[in-house]
From Swiss-Prot:
Keyword presence, Transferase: no
Entry keyword Membrane: yes
Family membership: Belongs to the TMEM151 family.
Protein species of origin: Mus musculus (Mouse)
Subcellular location: Membrane
Bias type Acidic residues, positions: 510-519
Name the record gives this protein: Transmembrane protein 151B
Amino acid sequence: MSPPGSAAGESAGGGGGGGGSGVPEEPMASADEGPAREEQRPIQPSFTKSLCRESHWKCLLLSLLMYGCLGAVAWCHVTTVTRLTFSSAYQGNSLMYHDSPCSNGYVYIPLAFLLMLYAVYLVECWHCQARHELQHRVDVSSVQERVGRMQQATPCIWWKAISYHYVRRTRQVTRYRNGDAYTTTQVYHERVNTHVAEAEFDYARCGVRDVSKTLVGLEGAPATRLRFTKCFSFASVEAENAYLCQRARFFAENEGLDDYMEAREGMHLKNVDFREFMVAFPDPARPPWYACSSAFWAAALLTLSWPLRVLAEYRTAYAHYHVEKLFGLEGPGSASSVGGGLSPSDELLPPLTHRLPRVNTVDSTELEWHIRSNQQLVPSYSEVLLMDLVELGSRCGGPGGSYVPRCRYGGVGGPGAAGVTPHWRSCEHCQRAVSSSSIFSRSALSICASPRAAQGPGASAGCGGSRFSLSRLYGSRRSCLWRSRSGSVNEASCPTEQTRLSSQASMRDNEEDEDEEEAGPPPPYQDALCFPVLIVHRQEGCLGHSHRSLHRHGSCVETSL
């Protein structure tokens, strides 16, 4: 995803006030407070560019057809042909004379086409865009004032979701066949809207400012055609992710309410009467002659509308002005907060609202890239099982470079650890590694290990290659134990790893005894094995062991690694 993405906003469809975005209604800061704006001047097009931009091909086609009909009528009146006739009045003699080729009524055919095309031509002149643009004539000063209001206006990015379904209905219609009327039943489907939801983009945390250009040079042209477009962009990835996250959350909440959902979105400027097209004149009371309505209709009646439009396009300057709002300037990642930390207003807010986590708003493309490269994301449970912790154990000071986990009671996770003085290792990375939670639910795995099983060979097998981590102790009276018998990676043969879950009775039935036990000294290592959950990591060097057996409430489940 490209960091500053931009999207054009629609001007129709209604604003979304139902979302309760909490965006302040005050106007934005003026242009003088921010950095210097880039200037934009109207463009004076050439003749070829004016034709390419707006060719008025409908008017041109109708004009050419009418000129062709007029040419046909003129040809009928000017051209003469020699005719030879035989009549009995002249006693069988032939008569030669010169006459028009359309004397037998053929002249009415081009006249009929001419009248029909002329009517269509006048309708096209009435509905053409050039005539509508002449109705929005404004002076240069009012244009500058309107541009200033749009720059200071508060933007509102809205979303609208319409849930609907189709209902099958019938109605009686009358049809005619061979002059006979008969009634039949017609089946049709009618759309029924069941739910309409609206929301706005809450940009209170990321901030917004106007980055539109300064429009200058309107006084230099006799007429300037202006087109205004609303758009918005993002200055940081966090702001864009906040927008995408809110947008996706809104449409996800309204997606399953009915069979179908119509999604609409756009942006409007609050308290601003937005107009897309305008024509600015230095003096609107005395516009150029080609920009007058009287000249336009006079040329239309004389079938000269297309030449007048081309002349007006050539003599009129053109400017496409973008009202652009930039989001993402007041967040923690902006330039204002890089050097000075958080502002006093930011310190009053909850810490989770300071920054939107990247992993919570990552899109599908970037998520796939993170999964492939295994970077910047917390590894999954299966990935943790395959991690090599030998290097981690050497950094944490294990004996012989091996990884020695420690339980929360202070005992060392190895055979003969009951005599070791209870203490916590100061290595933060080691503590963080051994305090991972189990992926299985404790309600689903309410099977405890018996004391006899804890004293078996599985609990005392202290292979150097055995790797496990201790999860935190839960408050329930039942706990789960993962016991493993695995050989070292350096050995010639690695025995089969058997992972079992055995049930254990409740440690204490009296809550007072539990409180006294927790307040007392740490229990021995063999007793401590019954409390935490041991997540046994399968050896990477063991070949041929691709399945493990899970005994859950007496049933065996084979899971493939």
